[in-house]
Regions:
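Proline-aspartate-enriched helix->loop->beta-strand connector
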Residues: 90, 94-96, 195-196, 241-250, ...
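Flexible, Lys/Arg-rich cytosolic regulatory linkers and terminal tails that connect or flank
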Residues: 83, 110-172, 284
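A solvent-exposed beta-alpha-beta segment
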Residues: 17-135, 203-212, 217, 224-225, ...
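Conserved Rossmann-fold NAD(P)-dependent oxidoreductase catalytic core, especially the SDR/UDP-sugar
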Residues: 135-136, 251, 255-314, 319-337, ...
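N-terminal Rossmann/SDR dinucleotide-binding element
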Residues: 141-145, 149, 153-245, 344, ...
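NAD(P)-cofactor binding segment of oxidoreductase domains
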Residues: 111-127, 197-204, 248, 263-290
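Strand-loop microenvironment adjacent to phosphate/nucleotide-handling motifs in alpha/beta enzyme folds
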Residues: 158, 163-167, 319, 323-335, ...
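Transmembrane alpha-helices and immediately adjacent membrane-cytoplasm interface residues
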Residues: 1-20
């Protein structure tokens, strides 16, 4: 009798609870939902939908590619077929929301299924990949709107977090350009690895302030220093290194906008090339352990001055590494105020002002440089990390497309066949951090970014994900290639080849050999010309970077007669 009473009470409570759920759902606008995946994750999502008082989704059918599951009924919901049955069942059940619940799906499989789903104009939501789920936590709250990144079909980058943690733990780390898209994500990931001190160096105070406030909120115990300054300012750079003595430098400060640099090539050289030289020089002078340059696939066979300037940055890094290994600091030239003379322990003036009067040579300057280095220092290791376009970064196509869609169009694409390699900002930064653990010095690390993506396809996908139909609701407009822009970008120069690392997605390019002493002399002339705002700067760059072939007639190119 007692057992029956207890059972009746429990049944009544269960009935009342379910009735309350149904009543609450009926009071809201109900969405007919399709679940992709009849595995463990899909079943957990299904059960939560059935019992949640908050969800407005009503599960109507399930899709799974396993034929053995077809025809089954799960929690009262039928498994109606595989991916080829998505479109017909969306129409049959009047589906307006699709939930992708296969966290273990490979990127290509996920892309193929979502490409079918986006034809339906349904709202698309997805669980993150298994590697992103903490302790396998599967729930409706983890369902996020499908982003354009999900349609790229790239496998997520997996890095050795233990190696990165040990590499960064207890180190003083400087990030130049720390307020930018890549720089700020570097700071976020570094902050989570228990550094001794994180120094953010940026010329744009608003960007620096934003990341400072974010990190202070998230990491209460982080020893954070935010400094404003330019990598073109030798005195400021030297003062920062002298005061903080960073162990590791991530050099992300750079001009990166291709069309703007085409019309201001001297600025590209001053900021990108000379700024890299000055920062790398200070790293050697003050005994940094490692210097990591953020480079780009536009440095491969460049057709624009921005890409060529980044190739020059890579050559600076390789030259610095060779000089560091050889201990030949005397080979380093003075680059238009790249360092300051020390008089009675004080920084004083531009060395160019004193060299002629004092008979001072580059070799004489090594006395001051060597005195600043740690006695146990074995030389700075210099490396570069090269990757493609990052989704969502400042100036990238995704934010531009979103603004154009919000405005009702048109969405502008330069050429219907233009392709680019893409990755997410966190992926790019993970690569940079992992590459730092592999570095011996002189390497150019390259990410295997999978297949190139047509920008036209990317734009159309983004329009569909926004709930519109391309060429119907939102028009596409082809504007023509911009100055310095090319249809295809390459990951490696043919002469470089690749070498494997422990991470199958990270490779090392075999550097193209060049004469370091000759290059440094050319760099000295290039620096002088850039500060004189020379009309011949593009021509000079073309002579140094033999793989640089400006696209079309360059606006600042002065041909030889």
């Amino acid at each position: 009798m007692q057992f029956c009473l207890v059972t009746a009470v429990r049944f009544s409570f269960r009935y009342v609870s379910l009735e309350r759920v149904r009543r609450t759902q009926n009071e809201k606008a109900i969405h007919n939902a399709m679940i992709i995946g009849a595995g463990a994750a899909g079943q957990m999502i299904l059960r939560e939908l059935k019992t949640s008082t908050e969800s407005t989704a009503r599960p109507c059918c399930i899709i799974d590619d396993n034929p053995n599951k077809w025809g089954r009924i799960m929690e009262g919901v039928p498994v109606v077929g595989g991916r080829e049955n998505i479109l017909e069942n969306v129409e049959k059940y009047n589906i307006d929301q699709i939930l992708f619940a296969i966290p273990s799906a490979h990127a290509k499989e996920k892309r193929d299924i979502l490409n079918i789903c986006k034809e339906t104009q349904c709202e698309l939501r997805s669980l993150p990949g298994t590697y992103q789920l903490v302790n396998g936590d599967v729930s409706l709250s983890k369902m996020k709107p499908v982003a354009v990144e999900d349609l790229l079909g790239r496998e997520p980058i997996k890095v050795n977090m233990d190696e990165i943690f040990q590499y960064l733990k207890g180190k003083t780390i400087l990030v130049t350009g720390g307020g930018g898209s890549i720089g700020s994500e570097l700071c976020r990931q570094i902050a989570s690895h228990n550094p001794k001190q994180l120094i953010i160096f940026d010329i744009y105070e608003n960007n620096a302030y934003d990341i400072e406030q974010e990190l202070k909120r998230k990491y209460k115990d982080l020893n954070l220093k935010v400094l404003i300054g330019s990598v073109r300012d030798s005195r400021r750079i030297n003062m920062v290194f002298e005061q903080y003595h960073p162990d590791i430098v991530y050099h992300a400060a750079a001009h990166k906008h291709v069309p703007l640099m085409e019309t201001s090539p001297n600025e590209a050289i001053k900021n990108n090339v000379i700024g890299t030289y000055k920062t790398a020089y200070a790293a050697m002078k003050y005994g940094a352990q490692r210097f990591v340059l953020i480079s780009t696939d536009k440095a491969v066979n460049p057709t624009n001055i921005m890409g060529a300037s980044k190739r020059l940055c890579e050559m600076v890094v390789q030259s610095m590494d060779a000089i560091s290994k050889a201990g030949r600091i005397d080979l380093l030239p003075f680059l238009h105020a790249h360092m300051d003379k020390v008089i009675d322990g004080q920084l004083a003036g531009d060395p160019l002002d004193h060299m002629a009067a004092d008979g001072m040579s580059a070799k004489d300057s090594t006395i001051n440089i060597e005195s600043t280095r740690n006695k146990d220092h074995k030389g700075t290791q210099y490396v570069a990390v090269r990757f493609g376009n990052v989704l969502g970064s400042n100036g990238s196509v995704i934010p531009l497309f979103r603004k154009q869609i919000e405005a009702g169009g048109p969405v502008t694409v330069t050429h219907p066949d233009i392709v680019r390699y893409f990755m997410t900002i966190p992926e790019a930064v993970s690569l940079v951090l992992q590459a730092g653990t592999y570095a011996w010095g002189g390497e150019i690390f390259v990410l295997d970014m999978g297949e190139a993506v047509k920008i036209d396809t990317l734009a159309r996908n983004l329009i569909r994900l926004s709930g519109f139909e391309p060429d119907v609701d939102i028009q596409l407009e082809y504007t023509g290639l911009r100055p310095g822009e090319k249809l295809y970008e390459e990951k490696l120069m043919a002469e470089e080849g690749i070498k494997k690392t422990d991470n199958e997605l990270i490779h090392i390019g075999k550097p193209i050999p060049f004469d370091t002493e000759v290059f440094l002399k050319q760099l000295e002339e290039l620096a002088k010309a850039s500060y004189e705002n020379s009309d011949h700067i593009v021509e000079m760059v073309e002579e140094i970077v033999t793989t640089f072939h400006p696209a079309g007639e360059h606006p600042c190119y002065d041909k030889k007669s």
